[in-house]
Design a protein with these regions (language model features):
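Short, flexible segments with low predicted structural confidence
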Residues: 1, 21-22, 33, 41
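Short alpha-helical linear motifs
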Residues: 31, 52-55, 70-74
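A short, surface-exposed loop/turn module that caps and links secondary-structure elements
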Residues: 35-60
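Enriched for short, Lys/Arg-rich terminal
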Residues: 2-4, 13-26, 62-91
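A structural signal for well-ordered alpha-helical scaffolds and beta->alpha junctions
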Residues: 26-30, 43
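PIN/NYN-family metal-dependent endoribonuclease catalytic core
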Residues: 7-8
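Generic detector of bulky aromatic hydrophobic side chains
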Residues: 30, 38, 47, 87-88
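A ubiquitous structural signal for well-ordered alpha-helices
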Residues: 14, 31-32
Length: 91
């Protein structure tokens, strides 16, 4: 069973801005979301819990430089996307 990815209005605006600035990453971004929907624990996503001010959030990698932060509601198999950007922007 696939996970349900929830795109908030705020995240959708951030993602559109991210793709506008980095059109070369659009395919990688889409592939990351597709893999996240099928298996958020896939090794290539490098899913990990965040600490400090982002405690309660998780992060997955688009590539070595760019990340998506998210919340995971494991019991309902929902993933709520929070932010997208480079390491310094999302952390």
């Amino acid at each position: 069973m696939n996970w349900q990815i929830i795109f908030t209005e705020q995240y959708t605006r951030k993602a559109a801005k991210f793709i506008k600035i980095h059109p070369d990453l659009e395919n990688q971004y889409v592939k990351t979301l597709q893999l996240l929907e099928v298996n958020p624990h896939h090794a290539s996503l490098r899913l990990h819990a965040l600490k400090g001010k982002l405690d309660g959030l998780y992060s997955v990698s688009i590539n070595l430089k760019y990340r998506i932060t998210l919340t995971m509601i494991i019991t309902e198999k929902e993933i709520v996307l929070v932010n997208v950007g480079d390491h310094s922007q999302v952390y």
